[in-house]
Structure formats: C-alpha cells, structure tokens
Curated annotation (Swiss-Prot):
The keyword Disulfide bond does not apply. One of its GO terms (biological process) is translation. This is Small ribosomal subunit protein uS17. Belongs to the universal ribosomal protein uS17 family. Signal peptide: none annotated. Pfam families: Ribosomal_S17. Keywords: Ribonucleoprotein, Ribosomal protein, RNA-binding, rRNA-binding. Residues 34-54 are annotated as: Disordered. Gene3D superfamilies: Nucleic acid-binding proteins. Part of the 30S ribosomal subunit. One of its GO terms (cellular component) is cytosolic small ribosomal subunit.
C-alpha cells in the first residue's frame, strides 16, 4: 500500500527534530453545498531542523518515530 503524502504549513518548530504541520482540506457540505475548510495538525520528523514556521512542506507517512510522530518531512 502506498504511503500517504500531504501538503501543509509549518505552525511550530519549537521542538528538537520535530515540526507541527497544519494540513487543510476542503469539501462541500452534503446538504448545504457550501465549501467547508477543515484543518488538522500533524507532528512530523525533521532531522536537520531545517524548516521554520510558515514554510510550505510535504509530509509522508512513516514508521513510528516517537509516541506522537508518524510522519516525516520530505520536501520544503
């Protein structure tokens, strides 16, 4: 099964080798037909500490790195 790849914005880089990435998705409400934006935060592994708050990044699923990290940053 292929690994999922998501695109989002770095919202926090305060932790060592970890960034928090906010991923936004858009969909139409099934009844109202209005476009709705929802976002979810993922903690991703950043071994070189190269990404800063506000950067657009792509993250990919990986094996668990810690209790809360299941994603790794692949592209800036």
């Amino acid at each position: 099964m292929p690994k999922r790849i998501l695109t989002g914005t770095v919202t926090s880089d305060a932790n060592e080798q970890t960034v928090t990435v906010s991923v936004e998705r858009r969909f139409k409400h099934p009844v109202m037909q209005k476009t709705i934006r929802k976002s979810k935060k993922y903690r991703a592994h950043d071994p070189q500490n190269s990404f800063k708050t506000g950067d657009q990044v792509r993250i990919q699923e990986c094996a668990p790195v810690s209790k809360s990290k299941r994603w790794e940053v692949i592209v800036g």
